[in-house]
């Protein structure tokens, strides 16, 4: 039976990416799209690349009849998302793409997002949406908390290494390059073409980036003790993609073997042969992740690279992967999209 889908916040980049992928999903049908500021418009007017798809017009959230919806994707900003989800029917399955339900500790949420959490009852039932590590929990979840795109990239590189005990937990550095679509669609001066093209800049450096909250939570959980990493993201003048270069202390061959073993049976995660490094070009527009490992000239140190598309595996693609599990569908359904190259 075809699953009826609503996308809340469909006028943003992640909402558009959800619509693009679900349009060819054999077991999902989009029956409602919300975009309050663009209510009444056709999706093809907001995103011309979706003109050929027979999508419903954008409406305000309160105009949607959720009684016939099987699952809702919530692609709204943090704080807004929790308020909206709190008003949805409690038997409705929800995949939230915002940061609102990622952090289990209310104090940590307030620390990183600057305001108290207003729906802790929902937070208690949310399952963190890093699919390959929470697969069984997601199969029975009602509410999924989608990961941050940067947080997903860093965890794919580091989490198996903590599990395998092959790195020094006190010396982890994540240097990450992110495409500009990760900053959203809102008009911002630093995202103007003249401000960004031809250059790059770090942002939220010095331990200020919000995705550090996810790293702290998840790495510490796996290690069984506090783990803190250095993390500096950089805004790049390309649209899609994340490339994380991770510096760790450990034997390079053991690190490569740990990643290869952990992801051996994962469809969307490919560990490249030792010495080959990941590239954003090779995964653009897809739900695939490439990981590469190489030794450093300094003995006992390794460099791990991970590439993913921030809008697909870093957000909307992974959201659909999680929704498949929640709806009892094959996990890869609708997601075997070949990367776009060049």
Curated annotation (Swiss-Prot):
It is found in: Cytoplasm. Coiled coil: none annotated. Pfam families: Semialdhyde_dh, Semialdhyde_dhC_1. GO terms for molecular function: N-acetyl-gamma-glutamyl-phosphate reductase activity; NAD binding; NADP+ binding. Pathway: Amino-acid biosynthesis; L-arginine biosynthesis; N(2)-acetyl-L-ornithine from L-glutamate: step 3/4. It catalyses: N-acetyl-L-glutamate 5-semialdehyde + phosphate + NADP(+) = N-acetyl-L-glutamyl 5-phosphate + NADPH + H(+). Its EC number is 1.2.1.38. Keywords: Amino-acid biosynthesis, Arginine biosynthesis, Cytoplasm, NADP, Oxidoreductase. GO terms for cellular component: cytoplasm. Signal peptide: none annotated. The active site is at residue 149. InterPro entries: AGPR_type-1 (IPR000706), NAD(P)-bd_dom_sf (IPR036291), NAGSA_dehydrogenase (IPR050085), Semialdehyde_DH_NAD-bd (IPR000534). It comes from the Bacteria. Belongs to the NAGSA dehydrogenase family. Type 1 subfamily. HAMAP family: ArgC_type1. PANTHER family: N-ACETYL-GAMMA-GLUTAMYL-PHOSPHATE REDUCTASE, CHLOROPLASTIC-RELATED, N-ACETYL-GAMMA-GLUTAMYL-PHOSPHATE REDUCTASE, CHLOROPLASTIC-RELATED-RELATED. Catalyzes the NADPH-dependent reduction of N-acetyl-5-glutamyl phosphate to yield N-acetyl-L-glutamate 5-semialdehyde. This is N-acetyl-gamma-glutamyl-phosphate reductase. The lineage of its organism: Bacteria, Pseudomonadati, Pseudomonadota, Alphaproteobacteria, Rhodobacterales.
């Amino acid at each position: 039976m075809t699953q009826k889908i609503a996308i809340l916040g469909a006028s943003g980049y992640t909402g558009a990416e959800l619509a693009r992928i679900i349009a060819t999903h054999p077991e999902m049908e989009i029956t409602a799209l919300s975009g309050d500021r663009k209510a009444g418009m056709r999706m093809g007017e907001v995103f011309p690349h979706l003109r050929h798809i027979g999508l419903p017009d954008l409406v305000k959230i309160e105009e949607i009849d959720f009684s016939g919806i099987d699952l809702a994707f919530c692609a709204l900003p943090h704080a807004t998302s929790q308020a909206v989800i709190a008003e949805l029917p409690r038997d409705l399955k929800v995949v939230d793409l915002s940061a609102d339900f990622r952090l289990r500790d209310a104090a940590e949420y307030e620390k990183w997002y600057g305001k108290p959490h207003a729906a802790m009852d929902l937070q208690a039932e949310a399952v963190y949406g890093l699919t390959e590590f929470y697969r069984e929990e997601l199969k029975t979840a009602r509410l999924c908390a989608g990961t941050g795109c940067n947080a997903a990239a860093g965890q794919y590189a580091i989490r198996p290494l903590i599990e395998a005990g092959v790195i020094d937990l006190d010396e982890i550095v994540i240097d990450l390059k992110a495409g500009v679509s990760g900053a959203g669609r809102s008009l911002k001066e630093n995202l103007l073409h003249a401000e960004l093209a031809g250059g790059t800049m770090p942002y939220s450096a010095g331990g200020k980036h919000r995705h550090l909250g996810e790293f702290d939570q998840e790495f510490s959980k796996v290690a069984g003790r506090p783990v803190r990493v250095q993390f500096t993201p950089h805004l790049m003048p390309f649209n899609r993609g994340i490339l994380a270069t991770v510096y760790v202390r450990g034997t390079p061959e053991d690190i490569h073997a740990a990643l290869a073993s952990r992801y051996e049976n994962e469809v969307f995660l490919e560990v490249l042969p030792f010495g080959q490094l990941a590239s954003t070009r090779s995964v653009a527009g897809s739900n695939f992740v490439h990981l590469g490992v190489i030794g450093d000239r300094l003995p006992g140190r390794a460099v791990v690279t991970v590439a993913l598309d921030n809008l697909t595996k870093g957000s909307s693609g992974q959201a659909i992967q999680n929704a498949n599990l929640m709806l009892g569908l094959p996990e890869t359904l609708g997601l075997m999209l070949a990367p776009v190259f060049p």
